[in-house]
Amino acid sequence: MTFISITLIVTGLLIFLSQLSYARIAGEMYGYRDQMTVPRLRPLQKRADLIHCVHHSVHAVCGLLIILAAITLLRQASGMPVIWISASAWLLLAVDTIIYLINNKKHDLIGRRDDIKRKWKSEKVFCPEHDNEVSLFRTLRELTTKNLIRDIIHALVFAVLTLISV
């Protein structure tokens, strides 16, 4: 149990630090959107950046919840506190995923219009993950896939925590 708890503490710390870094980058992108060349897309993209920032902040909180649950397990406490921690994390992740999916559905509906799709494909944004400029359209697609995979992985971590504590 000690090895599992220590592994979970390290995992939670890595999740917390990486997600906090991504939240900071998304927050900075929110500030730079006034410099975009397509004025019609600014409000839409600023809202997406804000939701993106909140999304990574939620995952940073989930990292802290993993640490809290692991410390609770390490102290040989009963399984009930870990179950409550996991339940609150699942609730956070569910709300976050729903908001993220609604936002991306709006992007899809707007992005289907040919005039905007052409501009989105030609509009270049700096992407820290690729360390160069990529099309806004490509970036939105990749972010949606990666973030949903991250939601599923974090939900599975809390499922494992719940099983261990019972």
Which residues are covered by each model-predicted region?
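Short membrane-interface loop/juxtamembrane segments of multi-pass integral membrane proteins
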Residues: 35-51, 116-145
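Short, Lys/Arg-enriched, Gly/Pro-containing loop segments at transmembrane-helix junctions
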Residues: 31-32, 108-117
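Alpha-helical transmembrane segments and immediately adjacent membrane-interfacial amphipathic helices
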Residues: 2-24, 51-112, 135, 140-166
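Membrane-interface helix-loop junction between the first two transmembrane segments
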Residues: 20-43
